[in-house]
Amino acid sequence: LGWDVGYGFRPNDVVQQEARRTLLASTPEGRPLLQAEYFGAEHAHTLVWVQPQHARRSADASRGVDESALAWRGYWRQGALDLYGYGRWGRHTRASAGVAMAWVATDAWEIHASARALRHHDGWSQQASDLAAHPWQRTTLGAAMQSLVGAQWTGTEQHSVLIEYWHDGTTLSDDHWQDWNRRNAALAHPAATGLPAPARAGLLAGQATPMTASSLRRNNLFVRLAWQPEAWQASLDVLWPPADGGRLVTAALQWQGDAWRLNAAWRLAGGPSQSLLAQTPVRRTLLVAATRSF
């Protein structure tokens, strides 16, 4: 049950919470939920209870997509303009609310935007200052904002250009990432910890823990070029966080037949040596896949 209007990032995807910008597109795994919907010709309202079986779980046992929550979406159509409203009440993250819009301005241009305010959110926190201890813990943090604005141009030959800029206040701040870099530098020197090399290597590997977030930096620019002639689809996209100049470049090619789908993709993470994307554990990824539907 995917909600919201963005491509690279979706602030109001409060039920499915689907991973975005994956190398291989796949059918999202459904979430256990109860749903009620009312709709008319130009409007609709949806009420969802997601993960009802987790209603009595503790916060530590129900982080992220596992949290039991009530969610609402309202939809109103006004000509070429689609308007959305969202609300969510999570068992431990409590209230959040959001709005979104998508406007088909011309035959070629579409403009979209989305924003969400959160009272609490799940995120990574550095719990220990001791270099010899693993510091990263998943916990409930305070208020945050998420927002996105984007535009897409589509040509008559099935060429398209998508540009999106988003802010994700649920990921680590620039100050936290500076502390992260300083900790990496300290762990690289034996005298700073007094630990043997294998122990320091394990602690350095643990520093990759917060890199599982969907956005590493809070502000990101995303550009995607695509071309889809009949059964083929070729794309090139770039993710660029202005804070440190890192970059994530992905080139992909897909062929879709009646029963078979073939995919090839190449992803490269890089940038200045101190940028986060240049320090990810995996910086080059090649994917080749064949999928048959039955």
Describe each region flagged by the PLM.
Residues 1-52, 271:
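Outer membrane beta-barrel
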Residues 7-11, 57-65, 95-100, 123-131, ...:
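Outer-membrane beta-barrel translocator domains and adjoining extracellular loop/strand segments
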Residues 18-22, 55-60, 86, 130-138, ...:
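Extracellular loop and loop/strand-boundary signature of outer-membrane beta-barrel proteins
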Residues 20, 45-53, 78-91, 97-101, ...:
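Transmembrane beta-strand segments that form the barrel wall of outer-membrane beta-barrel proteins
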Residues 28-32, 39, 66-70, 93-97, ...:
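Residues that define the transmembrane beta-barrel architecture of outer-membrane proteins
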Residues 32, 41-45, 68-70, 79-83, ...:
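Outer-envelope beta-barrel architecture signal
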Residues 77-80, 102-238:
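Detector for outer-membrane/organellar transmembrane beta-barrel domains
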Residues 223, 260-261, 266-268, 280-294:
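Outer-membrane beta-barrel "beta-signal"
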